[in-house]
């Protein structure tokens, strides 16, 4: 499309000014005042029309459904909210094109149109965002905090205006300005904050939390280059930095007034008051960047707070810089900034492992300091720390945020001066853990020596937690059977291959000292001495025999151990020798993060029913026997707004038409109403037409991205996820090779009778240092190059690897897929 131009008086948009409240307590976000009423979204299955009644939300961390109460109505206090129309929206876009430019002002081309449009939408989000925050502050509700190393968000523009119910208005406004909404939206880069299902789950959770009006925030890291941008060449996968922030991110608001210190290395000393102090080392600052997350058909807009890292200005060595040593002058800054350079830096080296651990601790430390600061502010002059679990729930998405547990204890004990017992009880009631894998080798383990060097105070705390756990295990199983105890400790301890604490050794040694077999052992030793004496000679032996006879006569009634008893004693001695609690010097000392999560939190959940059962019966079976009340299931889902309503509009229209309502977008159980129409010819025809239309989009997309042509009438067989041996892309492609081999063995007529045309689509990234996964990518692309150029096979079989798979690619592929491979 040719570049558009426009001219208008660029003043602040009318709808922004009219939406701004007249008076309120100061909002912590942008300095503006806000007292917008917090309007309740419809309950699941209810009408889309919303009440203006305020709601109180309680019981956030409960397993039960959230109760929405309506204690009062402040309709009179609520400002008159102005709903933007296309004219007002066009004015807003013009305003931002002029006054918040990301490009030169001469032309209103697509990139500039996108940034101006995004800024316009952000204005609408901030109004609701401030109102949500103010309401949560006023009501002092319990708040959930979701910590994740990944957020795989996808593009934000269409999702935001869809949730705001402004898609049509923005499409019309952009049309007035000479652009198409889809073309403008295509200019947006996916936020490079995640890679796989872990990050997509986190993003879907935030969307659903906002839609259901839960008081919740997300916390993550603001990666400058994401994981990487994937290119597919004749050599397979190549990685390049994904500079998604090159032109800035219009959805984020930098919060330079919100920053927290984060410390690494150093040493632990005991202060004059007897309390531990972590001093020295390397200090950085974590700075907040906020991203509004709007709910669907609700005024609720929650927050995703991302941390970026830097150092204080005084850390810049001006003297070294002026002396010409520029590397030394900026070394502190570079060390801080690289923490947030990329997601999952290679960990083959010690430096890589250290950087990953720095990332995890930065997320935990900055987030907890922020959470506690908010709790203290809401508590006023009297802070009751015992009430922290009643106001705060911290959910750890996988084991990456595990350091939340020792960090929360450190803050409570070292900074807030609570006792160990108080801090430990509070932590156990505040933190919860989501498990994502049942593979034992995939459960995170960190070198104790590495953590000791980087986070010395946390190692002390982790060892104390380990000691608490050991005493709990001993209380459950006792010390009578040392073999059983050793087995339980081997499976359950947090510190693996580490010496037992002194308090535990006392119990074990005491049990060994008071063993009932001790008298029998002494008798056996005496008998061995007698046998040695017998070898000295016949005369001495006879004399000794006479003496022994006399002694036996004197001590008549005392029994010597029988051979059978002696054998039992030998077995007992051997068994005790085998029960050694000493660490193996040949094996590394490790911290098992998953065990720390289970011991340190109040809940552990799997992400599917079968997964949760495996977690209970296999992965953490010993913990389940000890604390069955901790284990629960939370089946993963996806937001139907992004994944059906917005990316598959043709199917959405069909669902709404036949169900009779669009309530399925917030209550998927409504889709069950389609069952009665399953054999309706009209529905089936509409469904097939929508699917074929989506497949034609996929075919055009594949042609653009890979150069391969596919027919939309073939079956689209899709496997899109990160490349890993346990994800079994190798098994899939070997099956395709077998199919190809069978086709080649047949005549053309036999092939046509035996096979349905099939397009096998792969997508996903292999980690840069994961050699075997990269070989799988190479193998898939090589098979594709062979099969796709075989004129004998033609359209019967195609193999396509889509480069740089992300959410936006998935939004193309999923609506057109017919078989999704999960093997």
What name fits each language-model region?
Residues 2-20, 26-31, 36-539, 545-823:
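A conserved ligand/cofactor-binding region detector
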